[in-house]
């Protein structure tokens, strides 16, 4: 896996360094044979994208970053998704990085739409589902999520074709690292 254009000459920590109290820098490694195209980011509550997500070619890693809104005591949360071009699905990542750790924790979720589902719903639909909804959901989007406060154990979503493994730090300038890859013995998608 080699760095793509968004990480050329910088690091994930470098993407997160915006001078804001709450930021989230996200790196995705694509171990599949499918390009991850048409990134769609939805940042909640007037948060800002400081580096835009980009397509992720097979064998590459790319990064982007978001921050809390200016002049507010809020965190940053949202979703980003990419189409697995050729697999006719979307890979979806949800994050929540709060302003106050006295009452809230960092959360991250990863998942995939069912085959044939590539459309992105409007607004916060995926965020609300992945943050508040049951993880045994049998709808168009299937996912796992985890809390990153006392532990930073990975969150793993797996189906018959793909496995997504993600970690998130438990600090205000959060770093998220995610790998999407074929499941074991699924060499056709490698």
Curated annotation (Swiss-Prot):
Disulfide links within the chain: none
Where does the UniProt entry say this protein principally localizes? secreted
List GO BP terms, alphabetically: killing of cells of another organism; monoatomic ion transport
One term of GO molecular function: toxin activity
**Which keywords does UniProt give here?**
Cytolysis, Ion transport, Membrane, Nematocyst, Secreted, Target cell membrane, Target membrane, Toxin, Transmembrane, Transport
Q: Name one GO cellular component term.
A: membrane
Its annotated compartments are: Secreted; Nematocyst; Target cell membrane
Instruction: From the UniProt entry, list the residue stretches annotated as the region N-terminal region.
Output: 2-21
Q: Record's Gene3D superfamilies?
A: Cytolysin/lectin
Q: Which SUPFAM superfamilies match?
A: Cytolysin/lectin (SSF63724)
State which tissues express it. Expressed by the venom duct.
- Binding sites annotated in the UniProt record for phosphocholine: 78, 96, 98, 131-132
What InterPro entries has UniProt attached to this entry?
Actinoporin_PFT, Cytolysin/lectin
What superkingdom does the record give? Eukaryota
Short sequence motif Cell attachment site, crucial for protein stability: positions: 138-140
Fill in the subunit field for this protein.
Octamer or nonamer in membranes. Monomer in the soluble state.
Tell me which family the UniProt entry assigns to this protein: Belongs to the actinoporin family. Conoidea subfamily.
State what this protein does.
Answer: Pore-forming protein that forms pores of around 1 nm and causes cardiac stimulation and cytolysis.
Q: What is this protein called?
A: Tereporin-Ca1
From what organism does this protein derive?
Terebra anilis
Its organism's taxonomic lineage begins at:
Eukaryota, Metazoa, Spiralia, Lophotrochozoa, Mollusca
């Amino acid at each position: 896996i080699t760095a793509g254009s968004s990480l050329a000459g910088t690091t994930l920590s470098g993407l997160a360094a915006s001078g804001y109290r709450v930021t989230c820098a996200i790196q995705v490694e694509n171990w599949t044979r499918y390009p991850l195209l048409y990134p769609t980011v939805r940042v909640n509550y007037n948060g800002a994208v400081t580096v835009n997500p980009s397509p992720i070619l097979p064998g590459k890693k790319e990064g982007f970053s978001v921050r809390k809104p200016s002049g507010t005591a809020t965190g940053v949360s949202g979703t980003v998704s990419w189409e697995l071009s050729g697999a006719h699905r979307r890979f979806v990542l949800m994050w929540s990085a709060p302003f106050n750790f006295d009452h809230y924790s960092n959360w991250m979720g990863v998942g995939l739409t069912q085959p044939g589902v590539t459309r992105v719903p409007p607004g916060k639909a995926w965020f609300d589902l992945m943050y508040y909804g049951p993880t045994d959901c049998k709808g168009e989007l299937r996912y796992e999520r985890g809390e990153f406060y006392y532990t930073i154990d990975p969150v793993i979503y797996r189906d018959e074709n793909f496995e997504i493994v993600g970690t998130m730090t438990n600090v205000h300038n959060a770093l998220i690292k995610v790998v999407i890859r074929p499941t074991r013995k699924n060499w056709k998608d490698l």
